[in-house]
Amino acid sequence: MQLWQKQLNLFFIAMGFFTRIPMPKWIEVDADKLNKASRYFGLVGLLVGAISAAVYSLMLYWVSPSVAIVFAMITSVLVTGGFHEDGLADTADGLGGGWTVEAKLNIMKDSRLGSYGALALVLALLLKWQLLTELALFDPSSVSLALIVGHCLSRVVAASFIFSEEYVSDTDTSKSKPLAQQQGINELSILLASGVLALLLVGLVPALVLITGLVIVRYGFIRLFRSQIGGYTGDTLGAAQQGSELSCYLLLLILGVSW
């Protein structure tokens, strides 16, 4: 298999793991490839953002921007299966309801939704809709840009934890086993390159502001997760992705960035 075929294979594995989009039948999957596929987390975000932006732009022909945003949000959840929202809810339940590290990790593994998780989900979705609606008031086209950039950069931030933090859950039973293995500089370079692609859409100054803001957000999440559970789990990566996505929308709104 040639180099480009190997990379395409890894991208489709990442797409199949992080979304509900089916992989082509010719894709070769094994444990090693599954671990290396995290390098394309950002590109998968670009894809999810582009699909959501396309639905938003299409719906603008028939409904108001605020309603079109709801359809875009529904689309992203359908495409990903609520993968990251589930992580946010589990993280909120675990950190909010557990008194010890072991208790927090056990609560995160519980698929049932608790009060902390429900509150986190509702507040995150409301804030996401409100931020995007405010962007639409400034310029309806800016929402499409925000969706693409936000979905990509937030996944770059979340996946970057794999390269610097310790995985603290049981790798044998975890549903996020591909996120548990630390990767090398090649994987990190490809991950960051996908973030650069998104930043090219916003211009130099907004890009620098986004980088600075997301570095601060990442640091905050790292401090939180280290103090609470000593590292990260797949669920906390979902929480970091959702928090970073909301941060992107907030920063783009403050900057007033549009196409």
Swiss-Prot record:
Gene Ontology CC annotations of this record: plasma membrane
Cofactor(s) listed: Mg(2+)
GO MF terms held by the record: adenosylcobinamide-GDP ribazoletransferase activity; cobalamin 5'-phosphate synthase activity
Subcellular location: Cell inner membrane
Pfam families attached to this UniProt entry: CobS
The keyword Transferase is annotated on this UniProt entry: yes
Major enzyme class: transferase
Superkingdom of origin organism: Bacteria
Keywords, sorted A to Z: Cell inner membrane, Cell membrane, Cobalamin biosynthesis, Magnesium, Membrane, Transferase, Transmembrane, Transmembrane helix
Biological process, per Gene Ontology: cobalamin biosynthetic process
Ranges that cross the membrane: 9-29, 43-63, 64-84, 118-138, 143-163, 196-216
InterPro entries named in the record: CobS
Known EC number: 2.7.8.26
Function description: Joins adenosylcobinamide-GDP and alpha-ribazole to generate adenosylcobalamin (Ado-cobalamin). Also synthesizes adenosylcobalamin 5'-phosphate from adenosylcobinamide-GDP and alpha-ribazole 5'-phosphate.
NCBIfam families associated with the record: cobS, PRK00235.1-3
UniProt name for this protein: Adenosylcobinamide-GDP ribazoletransferase
Species annotation: Shewanella halifaxensis (strain HAW-EB4)
Gene that encodes it: cobS
